[in-house]
């Protein structure tokens, strides 16, 4: 079963993503720890996810060149200082969201939109979303179903282009409700 919805990745990358997820889960649950979501955590998570995917010089570090996102006209910032400033703003602004579901969506969408790394941004964003949820004892939910992947991407692209969270939040909440109904 593809727990993390890492479709299209090689087995090595799926295993890395899974191991990173399990490591975060164990840390948070061990002694009721709270994982602080800061720059250090973000870089550590990206490094764990991107090892072997990008060069060692780029793994766990902000990108220094431009990137493009397929399926959208949105172009993320290119300048390292702009990326760093926006990332600091995102990490600071997360404190405004006391509801863990809202915080998770906020962090995921904004980090994914910023594309702070050369590759692995959506995977890193989903892991940060998971950490925000696990900090509140909420089980993260992912799906590898084609329809869900399509809705996930549509929700993110809508956010990239409009700044409107509603499409992604709808997908996110539908997956949470589906999981809860499956438990009943």
Regions found by a protein language model. Name each.
Residues 1, 5-184:
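FIC/Doc superfamily catalytic core
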């Amino acid at each position: 079963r593809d727990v993390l919805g890492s479709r299209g990745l090689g087995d090595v990358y799926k295993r890395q993503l899974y191991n990173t997820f399990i490591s975060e889960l164990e840390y948070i649950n061990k002694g009721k720890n709270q994982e602080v979501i800061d720059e250090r955590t973000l870089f550590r998570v990206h490094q764990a996810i991107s090892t072997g995917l990008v060069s060692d010089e780029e793994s766990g570090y902000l990108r220094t060149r431009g990137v493009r996102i397929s399926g959208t006209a949105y172009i993320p910032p290119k300048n390292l200082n702009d990326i760093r400033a926006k990332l600091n703003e995102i990490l600071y602004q997360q404190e405004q969201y006391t509801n863990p579901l809202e915080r998770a969506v906020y962090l995921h969408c904004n980090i994914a939109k910023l594309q702070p790394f050369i590759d692995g941004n959506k995977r890193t964003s989903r892991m940060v979303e998971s950490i925000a949820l696990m900090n509140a004892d909420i089980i993260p939910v992912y799906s590898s179903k084609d329809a869900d992947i399509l809705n996930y991407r549509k929700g993110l692209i809508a956010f990239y282009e409009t700044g409107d969270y509603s499409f992604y939040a709808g997908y996110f909440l539908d997956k949470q409700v589906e999981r809860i109904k499956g438990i009943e």
